[in-house]
């Protein structure tokens, strides 16, 4: 469930933020904000589904997933292919997220 929650949250957050970007930077209608706000609310809800004891740890691990998802958005939606530095950076971030998620926790 955690992986699905993180991936869904990332897509919802990016879509919500992109709606504001489209309105303010691409001269789209202000009505783009309506689904953007709904998407951002969905993002916040989905993070509550992550199985973790502390919100801060959930958000920290989510950061790596968000970065990778943002690069996929860059490629799939905006049509700009990530370069090797983007991919190396995303791999480092996902590695950090994995350490946060799966690292052994002492009592």
UniProtKB/Swiss-Prot annotation:
Membrane topology term: Multi-pass membrane protein
SUPFAM superfamilies: Multidrug resistance efflux transporter EmrE
Transmembrane domains' residue ranges: 4-24, 30-50, 60-80, 87-107
Gene Ontology CC, one term: plasma membrane
Annotated compartments: Cell inner membrane
Alphabetical list of NCBIfam families matching this protein: PRK02237.1
Protein name: UPF0060 membrane protein Sala_0701
Organism from which the protein derives: Sphingopyxis alaskensis (strain DSM 13593 / LMG 18877 / RB2256)
Lineage of the organism: Bacteria, Pseudomonadati, Pseudomonadota, Alphaproteobacteria, Sphingomonadales
């Amino acid at each position: 469930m955690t992986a699905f929650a993180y991936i869904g949250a990332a897509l919802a957050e990016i879509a919500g933020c992109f709606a504001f970007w489209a309105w303010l930077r691409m001269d789209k209608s202000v009505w783009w904000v309506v689904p953007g706000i709904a998407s951002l609310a969905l993002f916040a809800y989905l993070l509550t589904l992550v199985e973790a004891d502390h919100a801060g740890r959930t958000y920290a691990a989510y950061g790596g997933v968000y970065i990778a998802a943002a690069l996929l958005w860059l490629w799939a939606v905006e049509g700009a292919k990530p370069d090797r530095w983007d991919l190396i950076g995303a791999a480092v971030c996902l590695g950090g997220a994995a350490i946060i998620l799966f690292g052994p926790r002492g009592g």
